[in-house]
Amino acid sequence: MGKGRIFQAAKVYQRASEAAATNIVSGLPPRNPPLWLKAIESIPPAEINTRPYPIQHSPPNPRARKPRNLFRPTKIVYPEDELRRDFYRDHPWELARPRMIIELDGKDARFLDWSKGLRQRGIPLSGESVVQRQLWLMENQGMTKQEAYDKARHEFYKLRQLEQMERRIAVEEARMVGGYFGKDLLTVGMELENKTYESWKKWATTEIARQESARASMYTNVVDNSALEESEEDELLAQN
């Protein structure tokens, strides 16, 4: 037995049937098929040790003269991948929003109905809602990719505006009854940035002063030997 997997295990029945139906010596009656041939016909061998041809997710290339990577699994591509890539390319800041990816039993998608819009029970609004809504519009209402994207995107913008208005009104109502809110994340980030800038400015001023003093001391330490060289030349001329 050769190394690796057995490639011909799935063709045992076909080969045995062909061998039984073929006469090696002409003139003799056909050979009796083996007893196990009927059993293997009804119960084929398992393909645990075989290497089946993987499912192709893309049409074959007619220009290819010789098939390559015949037994290599192809890339798994879903229709949502391209829609998701387009949305987050146009809305990169949506990736900065916190996401909740915890599910109860992994089958939460059964309770979602994208025909009713982007708001779904138990799922916060996110870019994935736009992707699933766009896919539903393309498959069920016959819209093109761009038409479904525009419709889902406008619905998403309206819901985001409503969320911002609700949040702003809630803050105003809380302040009306004496609520106090600390610094938001933007203010804290600006303060940290200003603090870092002032620290860098102080260091840069000190560093510039140090470099200027080093440059000035470099010129003051240079000894002028031109007068000494001229006197030596005069002595040599006098001796000659």
From Swiss-Prot:
GO terms for molecular function: structural constituent of ribosome. It comes from the Eukaryota. Keywords: Mitochondrion, Ribonucleoprotein, Ribosomal protein. It holds the Pfam family MRP-S25. GO terms for cellular component: mitochondrial small ribosomal subunit. It is found in: Mitochondrion. Component of the mitochondrial small ribosomal subunit (mt-SSU). Mature N.crassa 74S mitochondrial ribosomes consist of a small (37S) and a large (54S) subunit. The 37S small subunit contains a 16S ribosomal RNA (16S mt-rRNA) and 32 different proteins. The 54S large subunit contains a 23S rRNA (23S mt-rRNA) and 42 different proteins. Belongs to the mitochondrion-specific ribosomal protein mS23 family. Component of the mitochondrial ribosome (mitoribosome), a dedicated translation machinery responsible for the synthesis of mitochondrial genome-encoded proteins, including at least some of the essential transmembrane subunits of the mitochondrial respiratory chain. The mitoribosomes are attached to the mitochondrial inner membrane and translation products are cotranslationally integrated into the membrane. This is Small ribosomal subunit protein mS23. It comes from Neurospora crassa (strain ATCC 24698 / 74-OR23-1A / CBS 708.71 / DSM 1257 / FGSC 987).
